[in-house]
């Protein structure tokens, strides 16, 4: 008789403990229902990268002095710099510049250490191709702005915006060269 009563007490305690566990799980579920989703519907919605995002490298051919600092600081010696020495002006003249983004680790060292700031990181992150040789960008492909920035009608160049009046020392509200205008 006592064993039956002890068994019922034990059963009741286990049932209460199971109900607590279910209740705790339900509270966690309710807590997560109030949060915003962390994923996006990628092809239809695009992630807006942060200002310091390290995407595809943009190269300005006219600024480059062929010093090869970018090659020396690159952990994998990736940028290929072809230059020739012009004896008349006693300076190097850049002939070709290329980066293979199939190998690049996007560390940003080349951009950080470039003395003439001819390299910069863009916000472009869609570099997928069917052929890996298409990821080898020469100076012409590196010099192009991302297509999304060029063709987007909601983006306006800073040159088209009004400038600050004279005597005002505060910074401009648009801190970047390319600004997203929201209507």
Swiss-Prot record:
EC number per UniProt: 7.1.1.-
Keyword list, A-Z: 4Fe-4S, Chloroplast, Iron, Iron-sulfur, Membrane, Metal-binding, NAD, NADP, Plastid, Plastoquinone, Quinone, Repeat, Thylakoid, Translocase
Family matches, as Pfam families: Fer4_7
SUPFAM superfamilies reported for this sequence: 4Fe-4S ferredoxins
GO CC terms in record: chloroplast thylakoid membrane
Signal sequence coordinates: none
CC cofactor: [4Fe-4S] cluster
Binding positions for [4Fe-4S] cluster 2 per the UniProt entry: 74, 104, 107, 110
PROSITE patterns cross-referenced by the UniProt entry: 4FE4S_FER_1, 4FE4S_FER_2
Catalytic reaction equation(s): a plastoquinone + NADH + (n+1) H(+)(in) = a plastoquinol + NAD(+) + n H(+)(out); a plastoquinone + NADPH + (n+1) H(+)(in) = a plastoquinol + NADP(+) + n H(+)(out)
Described function: NDH shuttles electrons from NAD(P)H:plastoquinone, via FMN and iron-sulfur (Fe-S) centers, to quinones in the photosynthetic chain and possibly in a chloroplast respiratory chain. The immediate electron acceptor for the enzyme in this species is believed to be plastoquinone. Couples the redox reaction to proton translocation, and thus conserves the redox energy in a proton gradient.
Family named by the database record: Belongs to the complex I 23 kDa subunit family.
Name of the molecule in the record: NAD(P)H-quinone oxidoreductase subunit I, chloroplastic
Native organism: Marchantia polymorpha
Name of the gene encoding the protein in the UniProt record: ndhI
């Amino acid at each position: 008789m006592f064993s039956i009563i002890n068994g019922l007490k034990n059963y009741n305690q286990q049932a209460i403990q199971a109900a607590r566990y279910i209740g705790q799980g339900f509270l966690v579920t309710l807590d997560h229902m109030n949060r915003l989703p962390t994923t996006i519907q990628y092809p239809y919605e695009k992630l807006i990268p942060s200002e310091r995002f390290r995407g595809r490298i943009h190269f300005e051919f006219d600024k480059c002095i062929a010093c090869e600092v970018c090659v020396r600081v690159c952990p994998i010696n990736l940028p290929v710099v072809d230059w020739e020495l012009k004896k008349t002006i006693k300076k190097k003249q850049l002939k070709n510049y290329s980066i293979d983004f199939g190998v690049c680790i996007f560390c940003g060292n080349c951009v950080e250490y470039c003395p003439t700031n001819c390299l910069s990181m863009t916000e472009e992150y869609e570099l997928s191709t069917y052929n890996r040789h298409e990821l080898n960008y020469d100076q012409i492909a590196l010099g192009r702005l991302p297509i999304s920035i060029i063709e987007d009608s909601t983006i306006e160049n800073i040159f088209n915006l009004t400038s600050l009046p004279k005597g005002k020392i505060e910074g401009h509200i648009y801190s970047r060269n390319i600004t997203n205008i929201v209507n």
